């Protein structure tokens, strides 16, 4: 009888070990955004724009785009400019999970999704929503821009 009890305990221990080893942490699938990687100057390299028509995404542009500059500073400011000059705008930035919010002095804000952020690469997605006559919103297009760190 003691042998059966011992075998039962061993089998139970094995089942418990297998059960705990097979469980995974759901947080592992989340993209981890390191805020320190965002600080610095970024130049755009590629831009893809896709519209949403009848519920389907249609790519309208997918090409090199190298004129946009973003500089994120540790004090929470962001300077947007163009390589060729002629445009500069300063905003305040904040980061929560993978959502980057740029708040402008006129009270307007843009919320972008960080699809990827490493020490040298940044991929931002911006959703442009239209206000419909009935007060609802409709997704017009999504612009995904890839940047490389330049300093």
Across the structure, where does each feature detected by a protein language model lie?
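C-terminal motif of bacterial Sec signal peptides marking the signal peptidase cleavage site
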Residues: 18-22
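Lipid interaction determinants
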Residues: 24-151
């Amino acid at each position: 009888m003691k042998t059966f009890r011992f075998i039962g305990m061993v089998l139970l221990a094995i089942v418990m070990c297998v059960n705990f080893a097979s469980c995974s942490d759901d947080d592992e699938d989340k993209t981890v955004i390191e805020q320190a990687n965002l600080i610095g100057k970024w130049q755009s390299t590629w831009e893809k724009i896709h519209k949403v028509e009848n519920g389907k995404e249609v790519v309208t542009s997918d090409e090199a785009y190298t004129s946009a500059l973003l500089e994120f500073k540790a004090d929470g400011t962001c300077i947007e400019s163009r390589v060729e000059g002629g445009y500069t705008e300063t905003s305040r930035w904040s980061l929560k999970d993978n959502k980057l919010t740029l708040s402008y002095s006129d009270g307007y804000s843009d919320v972008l999704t960080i699809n990827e952020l490493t020490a040298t690469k940044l991929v931002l997605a911006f959703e442009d929503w239209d206000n419909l006559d009935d007060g609802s919103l409709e997704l017009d297009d999504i612009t995904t821009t890839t940047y490389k760190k330049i300093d």
